């Protein structure tokens, strides 16, 4: 279906709580697919936006809870089914070279009915009923081929939330399934005002390190370091915000401070002179007191730095 037509129904989708994946974001996700897949699968395919950025000759598979959205998909080589991906998997037993997904964030699900399901049985814990995020990740992992790659857009909370989700996240890390975590700040793409993240999954990885990415900055982090951080996968844990620090010339800074003090003193003297004239008293005793203080520091043997803008002497103040 043409992008223009999708744009026209975006507001209707948003009113129903359906998240629309912009074309630019779909392209971003596909950029992390570093293999030549024979097929691509989206377990929550919506109107097919993520699948639409792949080669038209590639076999495409998708499942969507909303049958109305599924009917909008007009892609070549596409096979799709309507139904609940978690409770009614339409592609049981199938594996795919490439999986792209933007599952609904933190929706409810019923883990009690699926505890013995082949997709979830190997994990030591199931995600809580109130948050199905990691359930979708387990579903995706099950359907991923041994040499395949999965790229999933998720809510950042799954990177650090604890309890059951923390156990599942630890299992993913220890089994070396997580290849890369990418931070996507809010408003980076149209219709994505909240911050999100991209999680890249692979099986049979050659390294146990995880790559963290934030804009132009990347950091390769060992599994041991992640374990030391209680398996927290927040990008900000491993890539600190860079603050540009201006190089400071301490001598010049001190010189400027002395010159500023002199200018301030001159203005204070002007003010005191005006007050004394208004009150009909002499300012001379005040000037004499200042001279007395200056004589304590007016040592001819003392040299000033060559970088000084001007040498501050007793004469400067006497000119006031």
At which residue positions do the language-model features occur?
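Long recognition/docking surfaces used for binding and targeting
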Residues: 1-10
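Conserved S-adenosyl-L-methionine
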Residues: 9-101, 106, 147, 155-156, ...
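Hydrophobic alpha-helical scaffolding
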Residues: 63-64, 98, 126-130, 228, ...
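Switch/connector loops and helix/strand junctions flanking conserved nucleotide-binding motifs
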Residues: 86, 107-109, 161-162, 190-193, ...
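Mobile active-site "lid"/loop adjacent to the S-adenosyl-L-methionine
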Residues: 104-135, 157
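Conserved Class I SAM-dependent methyltransferase catalytic core
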Residues: 128-193, 198
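Flexible, glycine-/basic-rich loop-and-beta segments that form/coincide
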Residues: 190-253
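Basic, amphipathic N-terminal segments
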Residues: 234, 238-317
């Amino acid at each position: 279906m043409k992008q223009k037509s999708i744009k026209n129904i975006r507001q209707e989708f948003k009113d129903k709580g359906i998240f629309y994946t912009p074309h630019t974001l779909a392209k971003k996700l596909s950029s992390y697919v570093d293999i030549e897949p024979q097929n691509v699968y989206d377990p929550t395919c919506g109107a097919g936006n993520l699948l639409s950025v792949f080669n038209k000759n590639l076999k495409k598979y998708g499942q969507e809870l909303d049958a109305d959205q599924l009917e909008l998909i007009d892609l070549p080589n596409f096979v799709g089914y309507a139904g609940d991906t978690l409770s009614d998997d339409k592609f049981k037993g199938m594996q795919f070279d490439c999986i792209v997904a933007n599952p609904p964030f933190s929706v409810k699900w019923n883990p009690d009915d699926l505890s013995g399901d082949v997709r979830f049985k190997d994990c030591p814990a199931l995600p809580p009923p109130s948050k199905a995020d990691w359930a979708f990740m387990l579903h995706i992992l099950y359907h991923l081929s041994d040499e395949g790659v999965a790229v999933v857009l998720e809510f950042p909370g799954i990177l650090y939330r604890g309890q059951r989700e923390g156990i599942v996240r630890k299992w993913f890390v220890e089994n070396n399934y997580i290849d890369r975590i990418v931070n996507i700040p809010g408003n980076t793409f149209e219709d994505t005002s909240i911050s999100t993240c991209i999680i890249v999954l692979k099986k049979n990885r050659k390294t146990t390190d995880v790559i963290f990415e934030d804009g132009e900055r990347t950091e390769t982090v060992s599994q041991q370091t992640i374990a030391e951080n209680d398996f927290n996968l927040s990008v900000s844990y491993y890539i600190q915000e860079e603050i540009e620090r201006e190089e400071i010339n301490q001598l010049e800074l001190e010189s400027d401070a002395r010159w500023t003090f002199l200018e301030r003193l001159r203005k204070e003297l002007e003010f005191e002179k005006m007050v004394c004239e208004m009150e009909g008293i002499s300012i001379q005793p005040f000037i004499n007191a200042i001279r007395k203080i200056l004589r304590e520091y007016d040592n001819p043997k003392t040299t000033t730095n060559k970088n000084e803008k001007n040498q501050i002497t007793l004469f400067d103040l006497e000119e006031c």
